[in-house]
Amino acid sequence: MPRVDPTSARAVLHRFGAFADGFADCFGRTVQRTAASQYIEGLFNDSERKSMQAMHGRLSDPVTYQALQHFITHSPWRASVVWDRLRTTLPVREGLLAIDDTGLPKQGRHSVGVQRQYCGAKGKIASCQVAVSSVLIAADLTWPVACELYVPQGWCEDDARRTAVGLPPSVRFREKWRIAVAQVRLLLKAGFTFRAVLADADYGTNGAFRRALERLGLRYGVAIRGNLQLW
């Protein structure tokens, strides 16, 4: 790896700190704000594994491991508020919108939504979580603008499992295409404009998804499966 001189490193850390400070009031307590900043730092550090223990061990000025773990697993804060704030920081509001699944390899049974399903990160069926994500493409750059965890139907209908992981009663099964359309509507309401919506065949083959985009007055460029019948 190329060496980074101390002056450049300090400048990057200063810019990162200023960026993270812009989200401070999304969290109600000081310990949450500190843990949030350090969790982001952990995602950027050089630990090969992004487990809590690996990230915590490389933090420059760490909170306790228990505090960092509690922030992710039990601390009450709303991801939607963080996403709203992130969208306000973007320097562009117009471009192409790319919708896709994001596969997160994950073992075990106690992470919400984990099961054997197609994982793009591995290119095969594997134990993972899947999120529906929307990315704005503009000026040769990509900007994440929405993301929501897909909770499979089996999870939503298993009361014991829901209780064990604290899945809120408001979470009900929604197909991925419905999550994607909800994200598009949210982004339009937030003032974004799209030259077109892009998606792979998992979305493009679904007629209900395409019709929803048409009703919103949006152009789209989507892949379809070779066995799709049109008339």
Regions found by a protein language model. Give the residues of each.
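Short, contiguous clusters of charged residues that form electrostatic/catalytic patches at enzyme active sites
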Residues: 38, 129-132, 178-185
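Short, charged/polar micro-motifs that form catalytic or ligand-binding hotspots
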Residues: 26, 41-45, 58, 120-121, ...
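An internal, acidic/charged active-site-proximal segment
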Residues: 160-231
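Basic, low-complexity segments
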Residues: 1-27
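Gly-rich Lys/Arg/Thr-decorated short loops/hinges at beta-loop-alpha junctions or inter-strand turns
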Residues: 63-67, 156-167
